[in-house]
Design a protein with these regions (language model features):
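Conserved MFS/SLC helix-loop-helix module at the cytosolic interface between two early adjacent transmembrane helices
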Residues: 56-95
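Short hydrophobic/alpha-helical segments at membrane-entry points of transmembrane helices
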Residues: 95-101, 214-215
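Extracytoplasmic gate region of multi-pass secondary transporters
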Residues: 25-26, 208-263
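Extracytoplasmic
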Residues: 7-40, 116, 229-234
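Helix-loop-helix hairpin linking two adjacent transmembrane segments in secondary transporters
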Residues: 126, 131-187
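Juxtamembrane intracellular "pre-TM" segments in multi-pass secondary transporters
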Residues: 1-3, 190-215
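Central cavity-lining transmembrane alpha-helices of secondary-active solute carriers
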Residues: 45-63, 253-266
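Cytoplasmic helix-loop-helix junction between adjacent transmembrane helices
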Residues: 100-137
Length: 270
């Protein structure tokens, strides 16, 4: 890999870290439920809403990426993510959190769709699989940090500036701004798209291929396990063992710690 590609890989890996911001929705929904005294059904709207936008925006994002390029699409996703992280700093009302989590889901849908192709552009065919797996390792670091940051903020173990558990939003906001600036300032040469871009229906028709359909179902199950563990693990410990939310928050981090180790190990195998 050339020196230029190595320099471009740093902001791309930081974008993977920003991709992990979406996993804060699990612990955040538990804290919002506790603060606003919501029912389980009402609180579960938050994680469902975040990942609902994957269904809506994944295919259109691919079409957008063909028009404006991979790097610009990732930058758009980062800007939307920054707005989603900024809103909770100003309050914790139900409506505000709905808008924040919706923007977080939209930004992450754009990022998930465009970041992997950007890695392919940077790597130019070299160690692509292991680089993607290492990127998932970086993403998982952000995922397991979120519950600890929220817990430390709620317990005032770190300066929370009156935000309590919501201090994780400005912390991730600063990292997101850094990722945006680094990616914007890093020159990445993208090859021009040859031929006609695929239409919406042509993209959906790929599900008619068994391997694509099975991969789609596998990813859906994987995301379901992620979201389910992320959201319900603290609830189960609170209900069965009588733990407080601050004490039970470690369950989500424990899951992501082992996922982080798995991604790191996988990057070496690949």
């Amino acid at each position: 890999m050339s020196k230029t590609n190595k320099l471009a890989l740093l902001p791309v890996m930081l974008c993977f870290f920003a991709m992990g911001f979406v996993d804060l929705v699990g612990i955040a929904s538990n804290y919002v439920k506790d603060d606003l005294h919501l029912t389980d059904a009402t609180a579960n709207v938050f994680p469902s809403l975040v990942f609902f936008w994957f269904l809506i925006f994944s295919v259109p994002t691919g079409m957008l990426m063909n028009k404006i390029g991979r790097k610009k699409t990732v930058l758009v996703s980062l800007i939307i993510t920054l707005f989603s992280l900024l809103l909770p700093v100003f309050g914790e009302s139900y409506g505000l959190m709905l808008v924040s989590f919706s923007l977080l889901g939209i930004g992450n849908a754009l990022m998930q769709t465009s970041l992997n192709p950007l890695v392919a552009t940077v790597m130019k065919g070299g160690n692509f699989a292991s680089t993607l797996t290492f990127g998932q390792f970086v993403k998982a670091i952000a995922s397991f940090m979120a519950p600890y940051l929220a817990m430390w903020g709620a317990q005032a173990s770190i300066p929370a500036f009156g935000l309590g558990w919501r201090v994780l939003f400005p912390i991730y906001l600063v990292i997101g701004i850094l990722a945006t600036l680094l990616l914007f300032s890093t020159p990445i040469e993208e090859e021009p798209i040859e031929g006609k871009a695929s239409s919406f229906m042509q993209c959906l028709s790929l599900l008619g291929k068994p391997i694509v359909l099975l991969s789609f179902l596998g990813i859906m199950c994987h995301v379901g396990i992620d979201v389910g563990t992320n959201t319900t693990a603290p609830k189960i410990l609170m209900e069965r063992l009588g733990m407080t939310l601050n004490d039970a928050a470690f369950a989500t981090s424990l899951y992501f710690i082992f996922r982080t180790l798995g991604c790191l190990t996988g990057s070496f195998f690949l």
